[in-house]
Amino acid sequence: MEKQKKIALINDLTGFGRCSTAVMAPIVSAMKIQAVAVPTAILSAHTQFPTYYFDDYTDRMKEYIQTYKDLKLDFDAISTGFLGSEQQVDIVLDFIRHFKTDRNFVIVDPVMGDYGKLYRTYTKEMCDKMKELVHYADIITPNLTELCTLLDAPYPENGASIEELKEMCGKLAERGDRKSTRLNSS
């Protein structure tokens, strides 16, 4: 009997806005992979909306994750998304150190901002922590805003050429032992 594939989805659950675990879990499930959620927050709408409810799960994450450790779960992949605090990055780093093996991979979507602006929940300290987290990624999926932030580069208001984007992705890839850096939009 073939082992059930599992991916840890370390991300928020957002009610409105077509993002987060609400989008990831059905896609992963359709691929016959078990989506194992690790919630970082619950939001009524994503943070680009002018108003939203934000319930930070930082204080609950360690106990939540401990259950997975006690069950001796293993994962075929670990995927991170929206993180709501510096402490959450540390919790995620511990998760990766515990569950990462030579048979799985880590995907980090930095989820820091869009269109040249960081989300309101992001601070300089959070950006520094995200720079630490991406070192553990096999695959990074930043958008242009996040790529510039991770590289401490100015956001190109008029866009960037394919060559400039390749160069930026290459610089980010050099900062860790990873398989791939893929650029999303924004």
Briefly describe each language-model feature range.
Residues 2-108, 112-120:
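Conserved N-terminal subdomain of the carbohydrate kinase-like
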Residues 121-186:
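Conserved phosphate/ATP/ADP-binding segment of small-molecule kinases
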